[in-house]
From Swiss-Prot:
Domain of life: Eukaryota
Compartments where located: Secreted
Organism: Sarcophaga bullata
Modified residues (Leucine amide): L9
Entry function: Mediates visceral muscle contractile activity (myotropic activity).
Any GO BP annotation: neuropeptide signaling pathway
Descriptive protein name: Periviscerokinin-2
Keyword vocabulary terms for this entry: Amidation, Neuropeptide, Secreted
Tissue localization of expression: Dorsal ganglionic sheath of fused ventral nerve cord.
């Protein structure tokens, strides 16, 4: 996605 939710995979 490229959002700031990388730790919320």
């Amino acid at each position: 996605a490229g959002l700031l939710v990388y730790p919320r995979l």
